[in-house]
Amino acid sequence: MTAPNNAKTNDHVLAVVIGRAGSKGLPRKNALDIAGVPMIAHTIRFARASRRIERVIVSTDGDEIARIARSEGVDVHMRPEQLSNDSATVDSAVRHAVDASASPAGIIVILYGNVPVRPADLADRAIARLVETGADSVQSYYRVGKTHPFWMSRLDESGKVTQFGENRIYRRQELPPLFMPDGGVIAVRRASLFDVCEGEPHKFFGSDRRGIETREGDVIDIDTALDMAVAEAILVARTEVHA
């Protein structure tokens, strides 16, 4: 399916939740229970609570994840084998899901299923910036603090230390602002998503890329057991506040 001719003015919004079955670090990661809810269900509920997302679908290669998604009331599109291995790209899986859904939406919101903690308005902020600026894509970023590269060093096999950057001491307020993608949300124009170019893995972001800022810790991307523990604590605390 190709992008509609009016892709820049078509502001209908489709969210694609990505959830692979395989995970080397945490087996069944996207289906694991966290704060009483399957991991991927947190993202589905986040998307369904958005004021601007009109439809939510899930792309997966796992039957367990598919069952969870359907129990949350969303459509599921099973990935073919070639889009389910470690070398498959996120954008290729999203294109497959968009095509399979037959959605005419001009804006696609990409959400990772292993991110159970996000600010409630994050997707709406990204969509608003995309629409207001006419950009090709908007991604969420946090400002790098203690892991700023100007404070980093190299450590070789003998234990010898060399500074990564310029050999000087930086105070925190002297560090140039740098930002890291946090995995919270990507909003992209359909035309950009389907503009594929071999050898350019970031081509689908388009030429006009924008960002929205989050605070470090606002978004929790689950890769390890420690990430799970942090996210669980945050989600339980939120539940207690609203109880």
Predicted regions and their residues:
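N-terminal nucleotide-binding beta1-loop-alpha1 segment
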Residues: M1-P27
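A short, N-terminal amphipathic alpha-helix
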Residues: M39-R55
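Short active-site oxyanion
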Residues: R52-I57, G217-V219
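Short, high-confidence coil segments that cap the C-terminus of an alpha-helix
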Residues: I53, S103-A105, G134-A135
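Short phosphate-binding loop-to-helix
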Residues: D63-V109, V117-R125
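A generic structural signal for short hydrophobic patches within well-formed alpha-helices
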Residues: A66, L193-F194, M228
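Conserved core of the sugar-phosphate nucleotidyltransferase
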Residues: S92, H96, P116-F205, E213
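Catalytic donor-sugar/metal-binding loop of nucleotide-sugar-dependent glycosyltransferases
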Residues: G199-I220, A225-A229, A233-R238
